[in-house]
Amino acid sequence: MTAETQQRILAAVDEGFDAQLATTQAFVAIPSTRGAEGPCQDMIGDLLRERGYEVDDWHINLDDLRDLRGFGPIEHDFSKARTVVGTYRPATNAGKSLILQG
């Protein structure tokens, strides 16, 4: 990475810091106990869409997972469990992929 590229990245982080802090504060203020993560998932999906990502949002079907190695018993209501994934597709596929999961 060149020094110029590094400086551009640092400047972009500095420029967006207040907005990112406000977004983080809004996110952590949303109650998200097990089984009630929906509002957090909604916010993440909205943020991804605003940034131009293709968003997939689906409910998790435990029957699809039961036979997979490592599956453990679920002892709580999982009927509202969802997964939200954002995908960015560049004009050309010339680089590496990055997955962020949380």
Predicted regions and their residues:
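Acidic/His- and Gly-rich active-site-bordering loop/insert found
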Residues: 2-102
